[in-house]
Amino acid sequence: MPSPNPIIQPRPDKSPTRSIILLAVAGFASQAQVRVMDSLLPQIASDLHTTIGLAAMVVTAYAVTHGSIQLVIGPIGDRFGKYRTVALTCATGAVLVAVCGTVSTLPQLALARLATGAAAGWIIPISMAYVGDVTPHDRLQQILGRYISGQILGQLFGQAAGGVLGDLLGWRNVFFVLAGLFALATAGLVFELGVDRRPANAAAVAREVCLAVTPPS
């Protein structure tokens, strides 16, 4: 009997190289979030009427969830398909990063960054697992090296965006630019998945999350 929730991967007629390039774009967008706040803190503190020290909580909020979420995502990516999971988290990231540009208080921004970190934290480890699945062993090191280059460029872009674009456009518009990067990655990933994909079962996703975070008895 066929599985009620088949794992959806990119269509077989699609090139793995293009799939990996799109994952690198997603990784670029994810890593651009990591350092973007460094240069924006003075603007944020001034606009939200607080101190730079207090504003730094938004950096901590992102780092906490971005790192800790990686402890539980493996089983979920395996269950629902790594490529589709990355596409879903990219779409979620686009929305959450855009929300960061609309908040009016520091606690709201901290919560938005907390949620953004939880979404972005899925992208790179699941993408690297997918690359390992579809790449021949003798080429894996080379392909992973190219994929990681996208992450490094994303960090550099994020830091530059926080400084240069922050001065030119303001801190809120920087988040809208980064949300656009996530949206661009989402569009490419969804196209690569194909039109015959099925939506994930929300109840099944919730069960997998509970199983992942519940310690064994």
Predicted segments with their positions:
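Juxtamembrane intracellular "pre-TM" segments in multi-pass secondary transporters
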Residues: 5-14, 193-217
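Residue-level signature of mid-helix packing/kink "hotspots" within the transmembrane helices
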Residues: 35, 63-71, 155-156
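Cytoplasmic helix-loop-helix junction between adjacent transmembrane helices
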Residues: 112-151
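Helix-loop-helix hairpin linking two adjacent transmembrane segments in secondary transporters
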Residues: 108, 137, 146-191
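Conserved MFS/SLC helix-loop-helix module at the cytosolic interface between two early adjacent transmembrane helices
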Residues: 68-104
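Helix-breaking motifs and short loop linkers at transmembrane-helix boundaries and internal kinks
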Residues: 49, 81, 102-108, 119
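Paired small-residue
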Residues: 96, 107-115
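Extracytoplasmic
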Residues: 19-52, 70-73
